[in-house]
Amino acid sequence: MIKEFTINVSEEHISNINNKIKNYPWSSIEDMNGWTHGTNKKYLRELCEYWVSDFEWKKHEKLINSFSNFKTNVDGIEIHFIKEIGSGKNPKPLLLMHGWPGSIVEFLEIIKPLTHPEDFGGNPNEAFTVIVPSLPGFGFSGAPITPFGPRKIAEIMNKLMTENLNYKNYVAQGGDLGATIANWLGYYHASNCKAIHINCLTMRHPDGPQTEEEKAWLNKFNNDQILQDGYRTQQATKPQSLSYAMIDSPVGVAAWILEKMYEWSDLKNNDLESVYSKDVLLANIMVYVLTNTFNTASWIYYGRREEGGRYFPKDFTKIEIPTGIAMFPKEMSAWPPESYIKKIFNVKQITKMNEGGHFPALEKPKYLIEDIKKFFKNN
């Protein structure tokens, strides 16, 4: 059964969050000057002051509710999703999937251009019917009893599309762990998922790199991860311990998420707001804070580790369905040589962007929209 859903956060809940922010003991935190050691105290405090004085969650709630929101049960988990029916004669079902620390907020500005391109100077016959789920454990979706990872989530997403929404065939797009889920859809659910578009490489071939160029890429990746891997290790091994602190600290959640937005984005002059407004940053953070899902959202890393981590199974052959790839220069980790990519995917399109980072739907929405449209027009 599919039920209509409307977000309606109480003013009391918002007020309680604001009080926690107001009472945060800033004097107990050292100012380390900059972002080298983690989230910048000066900027975080500035953002938090805006949070309690000027940020209006209800404005963002209204935007989300302006789309058609639903909930449905898949494998015992209540899944929240946006579904916007596209224009034209036969709009292709497109599953858009966020990762961590993202949410449905990432996609709010690209839904209309994809579903109603004629309103943006495009062709209505190139429209998609767009489905944007909150992943299990994230936001307004329910959580599993115990952690599971992207491979299981792919199974749930495929059931959402085929059993609950009755689409025999569909296509999928994702970045971050949304790309991981898309990979599993393309490998295990190719009878339904007919093509995927990704903007992040998150999975590895079990045979590893073979050429010198591929080996150099992996060596650079491993070196880069020395200062990047702390959050992932914590969330993949002991997520519960971190959650006790985060569940009662909106400031803590903001700090944890902001660091990644800063590190993984294509900033001008190291200015976070050269790419994102305070409102966009806080709307995404509030999805975690309002729903108390920082804990269960982090479980995806634990589940991923249990599923085998970055590597496909040893019997992996290739994802045979058509794959489109958008490469943004400030992605969290560099893309490997094309020789390695083509061992994993049946690559039909690679677009090398000249700007943008890990969150292209927020950073460079027009680039992502055009690349999605171009790829799925023929795949």
Model feature map: region roles:
Residues K59, F120-G122, L135-F148, N183, ...:
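Glycine-rich "HGGG/HGxG" loop immediately N-terminal to the catalytic nucleophile
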Residues W100-K112:
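The serine-hydrolase catalytic nucleophile loop
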Residues P113, P117-F120, N164-A216:
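Conserved hydrolase catalytic core segment
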Residues P147-N164:
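Alpha/beta-hydrolase active-site loop
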